[in-house]
Structures are given as structure tokens and as C-alpha cells.
């Protein structure tokens, strides 16, 4: 190998990864063709009153080209409430919600995606799966987060009307490209923080088993515990339609 090639490789090594490359690695690391889990949610309001909810989650496809159905299984008053999410590679998702008590489905308009999803601290937008190419990224530096070396990235949506958030900051674990924390801002004001913990390797995919979502203004938070998680299961596209939304699996 000649000296020019050695100098070129050295320059590439010194340059390191760009913010876009890091974000792409995060997405590629978590790629699977399907996913199923059961979730237990502890919703704590500003008075520390805790309400428990449970749901099931199923997905087919992968980032930017996937469909998912989230269905509440408890408590009894919201059992059967379900959300169909159709994610797209180049724009915000399409969403429909089924409410058994009303026996009707409703399309969730883009301007309503900032609303809380059935009393949790997740917004409808937070439940989407967006492709990395829908954002511009900037590397803010390297930081220790909970004694873990991380990259700190900034992301901004390319289509500003497609997101309630003007900017987000992400802490990404350098060892395995797992997101540990996301801070979401609206017009430079912190509105929502998501922490990811209990990281486990499941079917060769590093996966957070616990998510904590904090609504800063409401002073409330939701802790989601993921159980019975399986990737790459056999599912059919026909299970992810508005008709399927109306019927429990």
C-alpha cells in the first residue's frame, strides 16, 4: 500500500463518523422485519397518583416502510382501544384509532399528533417510526451519560410541519449505538424527555426493556416496561388494516 493511501485512511480515521452516519448506524442496528411485545405502563400524574395500563404492540416492516397496531388490553374501560400506524419513508405516518365504546374508527390528523395518547405521556407522534433521512443531524460532541460514553446529536425535521418538535437532542451509546435519552424541544423549550434503560440483547438486537417518558409542562411521566418481546415473527400484511384494527387478535 502506498503512502498516499495510508495518509487517506489515516485522515478518514481521524475524521470519525458524521452525525448522519451515526444516526444511520442506530437505525441499521435496530432493524428487524417484525416485532411483537406486551407492555405494562405506569402513568404518574403531577400528584404522584399512579395508574396502570397494558397494551400489545405488533409491527411488520422496518423503518420508514412499516405498519404497526397498538392495542390496549387493560384496564377494562379502555380495553380494545387500538391505533393503526402506517409509516412512510418520506413523510409523517398515517394513523387511525379504533374506539370500541363508540364502535367507530377515526383518522388522526397531522395537527392532532401532539396530543397525549389515551392518558399516557406518549404523544401520537412519539409512537411513529421515522426514517433517518427525514431529519438533518448535527454532532454536538461526546459526553458521559450515566457513566457511559455517548455521542450527543441534534436532529431537526426536514419537513417542519410534519413534527411538533423543532429540535431534538439524542444521547447515543458509543459501544453499541443504542439511544439512551432523547430531549424534545418546541421552539427551544424542553417539552418531553425519553429515557431508555435495561438494555438487553434480544435475538442479536440491543433493545431497551424500559422507557420513561416525562412531560415537562404537566410534570407527569409514563414508564413502559416491555415484556415477551420477539423479533422477526411470522405475520401477514393483512393483519395491519383498518378492518383488522376493529378486531382483537
Predicted regions and their residues:
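Hydrophobic h-region of N-terminal signal peptides that target proteins for export
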Residues: 7-16
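Short, solvent-exposed mixed-charge patches
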Residues: 248-249
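Bacterial N-terminal signal peptides that target proteins for export
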Residues: 1-6
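A short, amphipathic edge element
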Residues: 20, 51-52, 128-139, 190-193
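Short, ordered beta-strand-loop transition motifs
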Residues: 60-66, 141-149, 202-203
Amino acid at each position: 500500500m502506498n503512502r498516499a493511501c495510508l495518509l487517506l485512511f489515516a485522515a478518514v480515521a481521524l475524521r470519525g463518523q458524521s452525525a448522519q452516519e451515526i444516526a444511520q448506524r442506530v437505525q441499521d442496528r435496530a432493524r428487524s422485519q417484525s416485532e411483537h411485545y406486551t407492555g405494562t405502563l405506569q402513568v404518574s400524574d403531577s400528584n404522584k397518583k399512579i395508574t396502570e395500563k397494558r397494551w400489545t404492540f405488533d409491527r411488520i416492516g422496518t423503518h420508514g416502510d412499516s405498519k404497526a397496531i397498538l392495542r390496549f388490553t387493560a384496564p377494562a374501560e379502555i380495553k380494545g382501544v387500538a391505533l393503526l400506524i402506517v409509516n412512510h419513508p418520506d413523510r409523517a405516518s398515517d394513523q387511525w384509532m379504533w374506539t370500541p365504546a363508540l364502535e367507530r374508527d377515526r383518522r388522526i390528523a397531522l395537527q392532532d399528533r401532539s396530543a397525549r395518547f389515551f392518558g399516557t405521556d406518549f404523544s401520537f407522534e412519539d409512537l411513529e417510526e421515522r426514517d433517518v433521512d427525514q431529519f438533518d443531524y448535527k454532532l454536538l460532541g461526546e459526553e458521559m451519560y450515566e457513566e457511559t460514553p455517548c455521542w450527543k446529536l441534534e436532529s431537526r425535521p426536514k419537513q417542519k410541519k410534519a413534527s411538533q418538535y423543532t429540535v431534538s437532542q439524542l444521547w447515543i451509546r458509543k459501544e453499541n449505538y443504542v439511544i439512551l435519552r432523547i430531549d424534545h424541544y418546541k421552539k427551544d423549550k424542553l417539552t418531553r424527555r425519553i429515557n431508555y434503560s435495561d438494555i438487553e440483547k434480544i435475538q442479536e438486537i440491543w433493545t431497551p426493556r424500559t422507557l420513561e417518558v416525562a412531560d415537562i409542562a404537566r410534570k407527569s411521566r409514563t414508564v413502559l416496561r416491555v415484556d415477551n418481546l420477539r423479533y422477526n415473527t411470522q405475520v401477514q400484511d393483512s393483519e395491519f388494516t383498518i378492518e383488522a384494527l376493529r378486531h382483537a387478535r
